[in-house]
Amino acid sequence: MPTRLDDRLVIAISSRALFNLDESHQVYQNEGLQAYSDYQVAREEEPLEPGEAFPLVHKLLRLNDRLGDSQVEVVLLSRNSADTGLRVFNSIQHYNLDISRAAFCGGESPWRYINAFGCQLFLSNEAEDVRYALDCGVAAATLVSSKGGDSVDDQLRFAFDGDAVLFSDEAE
């Protein structure tokens, strides 16, 4: 029987939110696309370090263990090509993350695939991609640095800041 997606929460996450791609992104910015591609392919067996959203994704996927069913699915959306994305998928396997669906967009913004994957939420570090997702009618959020480190407990916490009060300089 095919898996039904309408009875689960499907969250799309960008590869730069899931993993720390700052170093390789610097290569891209300073040396160009070919140097970036060579850099990623040469390191495809080296796991990437967890990114800003890694603890959140890990906890969301652990909900399935607690609930005894697949109630949450995380889908990866990436600007990487399939070749450079191999390092990302190898990192997913290294950390035993249950992520099996992905779109590698070859440099294009991945927001176009949100509806095709049946996602109800899109999380990214890229504010422009988040705006496009919102324009498509999908809930989306730009992830901001927590600067608080990784949480060691199993609690899952969200803070929504629709009017930019919580995370602005004016918050006291």
Describe the predicted segments one by one.
Residues 64, 137, 168-170:
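Generic short alpha-helical hydrophobic face used as a protein-protein interaction/packing hotspot
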Residues 47-61, 146-147:
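Short N-terminal or domain-adjacent regulatory/targeting segments
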Residues 2-4, 50-53, 68-70, 111-123, ...:
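Short, low-complexity cationic-aromatic patches
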Residues 2-52, 152-172:
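Active-site neighborhood of HAD-like aspartate-dependent phosphohydrolases
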Residues 13, 74-76, 142:
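Structural beta-sheet core signal
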Residues 20, 26-28, 41, 45, ...:
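A cross-kingdom feature marking solvent-exposed beta-strand/loop segments within repeated
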Residues 56-89, 164:
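Substrate-recognition element of Asp-dependent hydrolases with the DxDx(T/V) motif
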